[in-house]
């Protein structure tokens, strides 16, 4: 039996998201395990493959997939700690200027002002908007896969409060504005590459906009439990990591200041040549 046959037989019945299964297949192919005999697979063999990955964050994700696929525990395939990416985030005005030039402006605004992931933003329809006690909420209960072939559950379910202007834009959507099944959600990410502000060379992507949403709350001292709810994080540790996301300006502010001490003359210098 080959690994791909094992995967198709054992994983197909597990209650995993469509996108998760796609990512698992990508992982097995990237690690060159897909066409190998299943009998050749051992924790040590898999770990050696994972160790060959340079990107620490990808290494951590793939280690998790391998544990899941082959039912290994953490003593067999250790947990790999990722390295948080540090963004020097543009201002809201700079981001809006770029977003307004995109055909996917609504999806990008949902990432920026509702903290949605790109697949969740693409799947948004007016029925998800509800008003409660004078405020608008978006029920995040669906997402489209990267390849556009599946509408399913999002990575994390939840209800988030959104600004009125954004709620009204969603409520104003027509049927022809809805994301069509078969259109890959990764098109939004790909389109961002051509949106750089040629004056200041600002680049955006949906994940960076979601990160801006979280960081903006942290800088306004929004309580951690509120950030956790708005971001739909599964645990408080993930939400706390938002506070660890600092840019170079924050680091400069953290540097200690060396005091300036006036030097004292220890003795009077006498010119003997005059």
Predicted ranges, named:
Residues 162-201, 213:
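Active-site/catalytic core of tyrosine-dependent DNA strand-transfer enzymes
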Residues 1-5, 16-22, 32-51, 80-88, ...:
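A Lys/Arg-rich helix-loop hairpin that forms a DNA/phosphate-binding surface
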Residues 120-121, 203-205, 214, 221-233:
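Active-site-proximal segment of tyrosine recombinases
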Residues 133, 152-164, 257-274:
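C-terminal secondary-structure termini that scaffold catalytic or DNA-interacting sites
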Residues 78-118, 122:
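Basic, Lys/Arg- and aromatic-enriched nucleic-acid-binding interface segment
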Residues 111-136, 225-226:
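Short, charged phosphate-coordinating catalytic segments
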Residues 23, 27-81, 117-119:
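N-terminal DNA-binding recognition helix of tyrosine site-specific recombinases/integrases
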Residues 13, 231-256:
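Catalytic-site neighborhood detector that most strongly recognizes the C-terminal catalytic loop/helix
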